[in-house]
């Protein structure tokens, strides 16, 4: 065993912040999510709306990355990206994904899984025009997203060139290859760290249109 692994094996914390019982949670998992999410916002955490998005290709190879939550209703959880990105390719082949919100200072995490669909085009357009101008420009030049590029300097040059080209444009059209996705949840898991690794885990599963609550082994 290497020294690094040996050192890591000694690193651990005891979770003491809270507890989670069936009698404390909402019957609707989205309401429970909003309660925890608003708590994270009120705690002034750094980007509590950041979430890990896990997708998988048709062959089963997983990919995970951090994206930003841009809408949350009972209908689903929204994020925006380049449709030609790896996540877009995965979702075209296998339209199921999971989100993970992790708030370490609260010793909490939430998993949300389900089917993913594209957001209506007008909603994507409306959101695109709310973005800062330079972020709109960046969406144009970062394509295909995850594609290889020779250097940072070339990326910066393309950005500056497009800035100059559209300087006189009052409004930029949304690129056709860019827009939103909505994860329509059929599964939630709420995790609260507890002492001695006896963590609280409560899951909600959607069965025949109804949410069923279960406690999971830690």
From Swiss-Prot:
Gene Ontology biological process: pyridoxine biosynthetic process
Keyword Mitochondrion: no
Cofactor(s) the protein requires to work: FMN
Cofactor details (free text): Binds 1 FMN per subunit.
UniProt KW keywords: Flavoprotein, FMN, Oxidoreductase, Pyridoxine biosynthesis
Catalytic activity line of the entry: pyridoxamine 5'-phosphate + O2 + H2O = pyridoxal 5'-phosphate + H2O2 + NH4(+); pyridoxine 5'-phosphate + O2 = pyridoxal 5'-phosphate + H2O2
InterPro entries: Pyridox_Oxase, Pyridox_Oxase_CS, Pyridox_Oxase_N, Pyridoxamine_oxidase_dimer_C, Split_barrel_FMN-bd
Binding residues for FMN: 65-70, 80-81, 87, 109, 145-146, 191, 201
Entry's EC annotation: 1.4.3.5
SUPFAM superfamilies reported for this sequence: FMN-binding split barrel (SSF50475)
PROSITE patterns: PYRIDOX_OXIDASE
Binding residues for substrate: 12-15, 70, 127, 131, 135, 197-199
Molecular-function GO terms, alphabetical: FMN binding; pyridoxamine phosphate oxidase activity
Pathway connected to this protein: Cofactor metabolism; pyridoxal 5'-phosphate salvage; pyridoxal 5'-phosphate from pyridoxamine 5'-phosphate: step 1/1; Cofactor metabolism; pyridoxal 5'-phosphate salvage; pyridoxal 5'-phosphate from pyridoxine 5'-phosphate: step 1/1
Function: Catalyzes the oxidation of either pyridoxine 5'-phosphate (PNP) or pyridoxamine 5'-phosphate (PMP) into pyridoxal 5'-phosphate (PLP).
Oligomeric form and interacting partners: Homodimer.
Similarity section: Belongs to the pyridoxamine 5'-phosphate oxidase family.
HAMAP family per record: PdxH
Name of the protein: Pyridoxine/pyridoxamine 5'-phosphate oxidase
């Amino acid at each position: 065993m290497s020294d690094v692994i040996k050192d890591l094996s000694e690193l651990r914390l005891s979770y003491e912040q809270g507890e989670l019982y069936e009698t404390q949670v909402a019957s609707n998992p989205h309401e429970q999510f909003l309660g925890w999410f608003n708590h994270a916002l009120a705690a002034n955490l750094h980007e509590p709306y950041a979430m890990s998005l896990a997708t998988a290709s048709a062959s089963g190879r997983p990919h995970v990355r951090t994206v930003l939550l841009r809408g949350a209703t009972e209908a689903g959880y929204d994020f925006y990206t380049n449709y030609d990105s790896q996540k877009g390719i995965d979702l075209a082949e296998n339209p199921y994904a999971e989100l993970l919100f992790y708030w370490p200072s609260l010793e909490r995490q939430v998993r949300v899984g389900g089917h993913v669909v594209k957001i209506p085009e007008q909603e994507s357009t409306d959101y695109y025009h709310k973005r800062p101008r330079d972020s709109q420009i960046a969406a144009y030049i970062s394509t295909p997203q995850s594609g290889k590029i020779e250097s940072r300097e070339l990326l910066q040059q393309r950005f500056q060139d497009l800035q100059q080209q559209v300087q006189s444009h009052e409004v930029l059209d949304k690129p056709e290859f860019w827009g939103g996705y909505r994860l329509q949840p059929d599964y939630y898991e709420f995790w609260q760290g507890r002492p001695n690794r006896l963590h609280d885990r409560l899951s909600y599963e959607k069965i025949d249109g109804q949410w069923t609550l279960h406690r999971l082994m830690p």
